Every structure is written in C-alpha cells, then in structure tokens.
C-alpha cells in the first residue's frame, strides 16, 4: 500500500497552496485556453490568439500575462531543445542562475533510487560547468522514514561528491511536480534576490512537464501578482528511454497553479474560424499554424480569379517535345529493322576460274 501511495504521489499533481486566481470575469477564458491547447495543441493557434485578444480588451495586464503563458507552453512542447547529461553552453556565469534539480521517490528506507542518482550526476556536472550558480534540490518525504526527504538526501549526495554546501538550496515540502514549481518559485523569490534565471534538471520523460509548470508559475506570478520573473533558460536530462509525460498532466498542473477548475474528461472544444490579423502572430503557435493550416495561405480575390484564364492564355505553358521526339526515333528504328532490304551488290574482282580437269 505504501508503494502504491508513493507512485501516486509521483504521478499525480496534488493540490497546492496557491493564491486564488484573481481572474474574476476572465476565469472562463483561462479555462478555455488550457482546454483548447490540451486538445488541439498548435492547431488552435488562431483560437488561442483570439481568446487572448478578447482578454486584453477586458484587462490588458491579464491578457498579456496569458499570452506569455500560452506562448511559453507552446514553445516548451514544440520547439524547446532537450539537452542530455549537462546544461547547454551560454548560460549566465554568475549567481543570477539557479540550477533546479527535480526530486524522485525515495526507497522505503529513505535511500536514493538509481534514477535520482542519475539526475544528481547531471546536476553535479552542470554545477561544475557553472561554478557560480545556485543548486536547488526539491522534494519532500516520499520514503517511510520520518524526516528523511528527497531534498535532504539529494543535498547529502551532492556534498559527498564535492559540491560546496554554500551553493545548495533545499526545498523539502513538495510531493508533486506542481508543488515543486510553486514552492521553488516562492523560495527563490523570497530568499534569493540575485536569482533571475533557472535551468531545470530531470529525467527525459519528465522535463517537458517540469519546464512547463515552472514557466507557468513564473509567468502567472509576474503577470498577475507583480512578482519577480524567473526566466527559464535551459534544461538537462538523464536518459531513461521512457515515454514523455502526457499533456493532460501539464494542463492539470497549470490549472492548479492558477486555481482554475479542471476536468480531464472534458469534451474537446471545437475550433472556430478567426479572421486573420494583418500582422502575423509571433511565437511557436503561429509558426506551426502557418505551416499546417490552409487558411493561413493568401487567398486570391474575385478579380484575380476572373482574370486567371486570360492570364493563362497570355502566358501559355511551355511545351516539352522530348517525348514526341523520342517516340519518332523509336518508330524509325522499328521500321528500319522490319522493312525487307535488297541485297547489296559487292564490287569485287573476278577471280580466274581454276581448271579441275585432270589430264
């Protein structure tokens, strides 16, 4: 029974203590945005743009916040590069960077499982690459030993393997990915004023969900509550070969972060036609939509359609004579072979006749 509960804690995001959404009349718009992206992803580009446009007309601040929330969610799922074994080059080399290491369920005796050790190895390698960055380990008690937390065991492992204790930050309360995002944001913004950028480390199948929820928490707090923006600037994973988390887990976590109602069995909302704006929408949603949606292509006007046959007559297509020429040559060869020919006379000298009569 304990093992089952631990597994559920890792898979299902638990309710977290987050402030009310504060969206008021705009709350249904937020629910719609999450449902549209959950069920249609990039194909909902126009509809998502239209909903955020309506929100900005009612409340420019909230509309802009949701525009960024949806942009980042789309980017993380469609364009974000996932790095193996170590964080990428080019991240800040000072203490504005915090490396966030996602926890993983402990064994019943409180010891670290192999997958968590793999995550810590990626974290240690990345911490060596960025020697001035903070390292935040996050995770609560998931074993059977009271007081033994994922964060505590992760910190002990990093210290044992050479990382300075002064660089390690521990978040010991979270029992789900959603709680990780909420509690880490609160801890960093309240107690570590130098931090403005984060890089997330987890397993391959878990990195998309982790990044999506951390970005959503930061965008929501900065856009709605006037909080500090923690920019997601990188990631690194340990390879497990496991399939990615479902998009439904991301949608559920985002709903919890913003205190919005969520039902995973909700019927998919239908897409509706939206008049294309004069200027293209910036972001992954628009980029993918332009590639996949026929109505993003420029449609000819009625005058252009009526003038099209005349234009075709004025500029006829260039004919190719390669095939008729080849066919003619083939026919000539066949005729040359089949038509009977007269024997050709040879011009040779007359040889003297030999006399074979024996005298």
Question: For the regions a protein language model found, what residue spans apply to each?
Answer:
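Membrane-interface motif at the C-terminal end of an N-terminal transmembrane signal
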Residues: 13-19, 340-342
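Cytoplasmic C-terminal tails of single-pass
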Residues: 344-359
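Hydrophobic core
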Residues: 6-14
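Juxtamembrane/start-of-transmembrane alpha-helix segments at the extracytoplasmic/lumenal side
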Residues: 312-328
